[in-house]
């Protein structure tokens, strides 16, 4: 099962306090496990505030979105992850997720924010979600997650508070109508 570049939508019955009603973009999936970013939990920090805290002395005239930094997951919460559209510029620590999306963990991408070199679309997250080999596949088989193809509209344009509902609409049915457990006659 190939899960890279997919969205995980938490089933309504998922009771985990961190992942209940979450939407996660899977950035990497291989035989070692999976890594993703939660798209609908935010910190109380805006991108502009993050840039200031990182002590970047940016040139005047740069404008930063008032977008909040996402709480990308419970792992490595002190580490930044920037998911962005591909650019002509190469960043120090970038991973190609798709032909059009990259995940960067180096500060050099932040230095481009507010300039023509900046990615057209991006989101900034602190922390990520990870799964060991086979763990995510088991959670999917246990009906914890629904899987749909990702799209840039959900990733970058839908407000975080509406993400779970918007992602569910990609399914073509309401997950609340599903039964969480199979029955036998």
Curated annotation (Swiss-Prot):
GO terms for cellular component: cytosol. Pfam families: DUF179 (PF02622). Transmembrane segments: none annotated. InterPro entries: AlgH-like. HAMAP family: UPF0301. Belongs to the UPF0301 (AlgH) family. This is UPF0301 protein MS0260. It comes from Mannheimia succiniciproducens (strain KCTC 0769BP / MBEL55E).
